[in-house]
Amino acid sequence: MKKADFVHSRLSPLLRALDDDILAVSYGKVGTKEHVYIIFDGGYLAIDVSGLDNAGITELVIRRLIRNDRSSK
């Protein structure tokens, strides 16, 4: 499955079910850089996922969300 399809069809529903503050999850690629964007009501979080497979993207994004949530409290 392509990364963009994975992020939009699998990762986005999972993350939005886990956190009501997440409005959308998107994937973007410019040149060799790949990012997952998590959009909240007051902004967004961009996570560099270059070179990762779908499982790696899921793990990294969840770890970053947990770390981001802890630092905001």
Cite the ranges covered by each PLM segment.
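Short, flexible helical or helix-coil boundary motifs
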Residues: 14, 18-29, 64-73
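Intrinsically disordered, low-complexity peptide-like regions
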Residues: 6, 17-19, 33, 39, ...
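Acidic, low-complexity, intrinsically disordered interaction modules
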Residues: 23-56
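Mixed-charge, Lys/Arg-enriched low-complexity segments
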Residues: 2-8, 56-73
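Negatively charged, low-complexity tracts enriched in Asp/Glu with abundant Ser/Thr
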Residues: 1-21
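Compositionally biased, low-complexity segments enriched in small residues
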Residues: 18, 50-53, 62
